[in-house]
């Protein structure tokens, strides 16, 4: 009896030790799910409520792949960025209109504690959601071909199917008053129901140090939300939350002008790209 009990305990201990890494991943997942439910709450309106009800965005399903500690950290950073960005969008109070175009595109802004001034672009694009996803995610590195505000985007590392580390080199703006900037960011992509969320924020990547002659700026929690326009599923409602610390000394009036104009120009260039470039088999 004693020998049988000993073998049972020893076998259980061996299996426990062998599965410790998997258990750690499960713990990360469980904590993420709990944080996300608390952050988003039960009173989320519209598409935000749909995202929350379908599944926890922060508690994503980690693949069977065993990630390193650094990779797990990047995954968590991306999901935290998504949580924070969606939390900002979910708060409807305090938004002020920066600009509105004749086609209905508008930019709003507000001050967010511990983040600073954020900008919110609201547009409707006459293309299905999967087409936008293809251009903004699958063809991310080609953005410099159609968006003159971006010189280059390069994927530095892919982690699973949802997370990437990127380096972005932005062009000078405002008649060279704002010199070239670059960004190193972690980006996370999720779909829940008919809504796609693309989120990100600044991170550190040892293999991409600061570049000579370029100021290393930082994205705060930022995201794009894509979902079919109500009543017109062939069109897409795009909401872009932009939060950036450009670094260096710049007047606030210049910063506000550059960021709001950047969003308007992005929408215009995106439409032209979608009209000119054929779609492939893409699905968000």
Curated annotation (Swiss-Prot):
Gene3D superfamilies per the UniProt record, alphabetical: 3.30.530.20
Tissue: Expressed within glia and neurons in discrete regions of the brain.
PROSITE patterns, alphabetized: START
Positions of modified residues (Phosphoserine): 56, 194
Pathway(s) this gene product operates in, as recorded in its UniProt entry: Steroid metabolism; cholesterol metabolism
Cellular localisation: Mitochondrion
Main localisation: mitochondrion
Keywords: Lipid transport, Lipid-binding, Mitochondrion, Phosphoprotein, Steroidogenesis, Transit peptide, Transport
GO MF term list: cholesterol binding; cholesterol transfer activity
Alphabetical list of InterPro entries matching this protein: StAR (IPR029866), StAR-like (IPR000799), START-like_dom_sf (IPR023393), START_lipid-bd_dom (IPR002913)
A Pfam family it matches: START
Top-rank lineage group of the source organism: Eukaryota
Entry keyword Nuclease: no
GO cellular component, as recorded: mitochondrial crista; mitochondrion; neuronal cell body
Domain START as annotated: residue spans: 66-279
Transit peptide per record: 1-62
Swiss-Prot/TrEMBL GO biological process terms: bile acid biosynthetic process; biphenyl metabolic process; cellular response to alkaloid; cellular response to antibiotic; cellular response to cadmium ion; cellular response to cAMP; cellular response to dexamethasone stimulus; cellular response to epinephrine stimulus
Keyword Repeat: no
Catalytic reactions on record: cholesterol(in) = cholesterol(out)
Subunit structure: May interact with TSPO.
Function: Plays a key role in steroid hormone synthesis by enhancing the metabolism of cholesterol into pregnenolone. Transporter that binds to and transport cholesterol through the intermembrane space of the mitochondrion.
Protein name per Swiss-Prot or TrEMBL: Steroidogenic acute regulatory protein, mitochondrial
């Amino acid at each position: 009896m004693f020998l049988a009990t000993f073998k049972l305990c020893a076998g259980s201990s061996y299996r426990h030790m062998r599965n410790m890494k998997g258990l750690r991943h499960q713990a990360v997942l469980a904590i993420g799910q709990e944080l996300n439910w608390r952050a988003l709450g039960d009173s989320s309106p519209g598409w935000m409520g749909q995202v929350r009800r379908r599944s926890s965005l922060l508690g994503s399903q980690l693949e069977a792949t065993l990630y390193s500690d650094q990779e797990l950290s990047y995954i968590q950073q991306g999901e935290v960025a998504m949580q924070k960005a969606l939390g900002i969008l979910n708060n409807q109070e305090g938004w002020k209109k920066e600009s509105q175009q004749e086609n209905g595109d508008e930019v709003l802004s507000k001050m967010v504690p511990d983040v600073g001034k954020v900008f919110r672009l609201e547009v409707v694009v006459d293309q299905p959601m999967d087409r936008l996803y293809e251009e903004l995610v699958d063809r991310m590195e080609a953005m410099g071909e159609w968006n003159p505000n971006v010189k280059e985007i390069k994927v530095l590392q892919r982690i699973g199917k949802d997370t990437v580390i990127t380096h972005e080199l932005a062009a000078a703006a405002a008649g060279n008053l704002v010199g070239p900037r670059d960004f190193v960011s972690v980006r996370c992509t999720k779909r829940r129901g008919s809504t796609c969320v693309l989120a990100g924020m600044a991170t550190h990547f040892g293999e991409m140090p600061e570049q000579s002659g370029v100021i290393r700026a930082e994205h705060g929690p930022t995201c794009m939300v894509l979902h079919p326009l109500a009543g017109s599923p062939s069109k897409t409602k795009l909401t872009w939350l932009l939060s950036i610390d450009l670094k260096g000394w710049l007047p606030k009036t210049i910063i506000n002008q550059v960021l709001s104009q950047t969003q308007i120009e992005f929408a215009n260039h995106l439409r032209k790209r979608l009209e000119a470039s054929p779609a492939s088999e893409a699905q968000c």
